Amino acid sequence: MADDPSGSKVVLCLDVGERHIGLARTVADVGTAFPAGFIDMGLPTATARAVVDSVELEGAGCLVVGLPLALD
């Protein structure tokens, strides 16, 4: 898992929806996630490339994928 500058483990969280993938970044030993943007769903290869780019940009060593089914 990648380390952030403080030496903690960086986790990128994905909330996959029909039109967007929401991104949140957290540090494993902190537990609070913060918004990190979103990816518009497009062609599968372009969307996958955008996810890989986000992982690299955030320096994530772990990826957590969620599937939000409702807002309640």
Locate the predicted segments by residue.
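Gly/Thr-rich phosphate-binding beta-strand-loop-beta motif of the actin/hexokinase/Hsp70
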Residues: 2-31
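N-terminal phosphate-binding loop and adjacent alpha-helix
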Residues: 35-60, 72
